[in-house]
């Protein structure tokens, strides 16, 4: 599995600066259409290398990348050699959390793009719509490869996505999927045990509790 990084600083060296916003949006759009993870990076809060507060243009830039559907917004120089690394991180979190309040509820529109692409995407689409209709607290995805969590992530559900896997490399991959909370589970031999343990660790981690509505999405062959 591969992902794409939209490194605007490097792109600005290779193409005219005025073309960078167009290609950023196109790359994010194509990654979302093909379920590829996409990271938007470089010069996002660049002024915070020197100043404790960003410019309003930088705040808007970060928010627009999230509105466009990027999985990750990433700091670079701001935390690598800036004077205000913690402040930059906190500001990035605040922007993301505020912007995602507007994204919530858009899953029905986003899902229409994906629902006819494959059996797997159709199943994920139906699951997200069910979770939204039931106001579910979480969608629990037991997964061997991270594929189920990745597909569900691109549909931007209102519910938390909990990606459960026994494999560390899969858990690391799921860290960059939008809205996915990776949790490690034990290796089980039956589908029933896999699902049961996924629910147990989700509750132990505090993502769900007794009485919550939870949807379990598993593309594991039964």
PLM features per residue range, with description:
Residues 1-42, 48-59:
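Conserved alpha/beta-domain cores
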């Amino acid at each position: 599995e591969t992902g794409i990084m939209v490194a605007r600083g490097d792109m600005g060296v290779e193409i005219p600066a005025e073309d960078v916003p167009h290609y950023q949006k196109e790359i994010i759009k194509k990654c979302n259409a093909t379920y590829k993870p996409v990271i938007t990076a470089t010069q996002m809060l660049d002024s915070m290398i020197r100043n404790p507060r960003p410019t309003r243009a930088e705040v808007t830039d970060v928010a627009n990348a999230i509105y466009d559907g990027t999985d990750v917004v990433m700091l670079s120089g701001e935390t690598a050699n800036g004077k205000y690394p913690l402040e930059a991180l906190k500001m990035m979190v605040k922007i993301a959390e505020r912007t995602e309040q507007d994204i919530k509820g858009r899953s029905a529109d986003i899902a229409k793009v994906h629902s006819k692409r494959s059996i797997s995407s159709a199943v994920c689409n139906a699951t997200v719509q069910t979770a939204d209709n039931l106001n579910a607290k979480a969608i629990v995805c037991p997964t061997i490869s991270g594929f189920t969590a990745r597909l569900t992530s691109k549909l931007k559900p209102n519910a938390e996505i909990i990606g459960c896997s026994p494999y560390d490399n899969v858990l690391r991959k799921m860290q960059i999927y939008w809205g996915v909370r990776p949790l490690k589970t034990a290796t089980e031999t039956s589908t029933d045990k896999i699902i049961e343990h996924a629910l147990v660790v989700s509750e132990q981690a505090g993502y769900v509790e007794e009485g919550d509505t939870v949807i379990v999405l598993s593309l594991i062959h039964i």
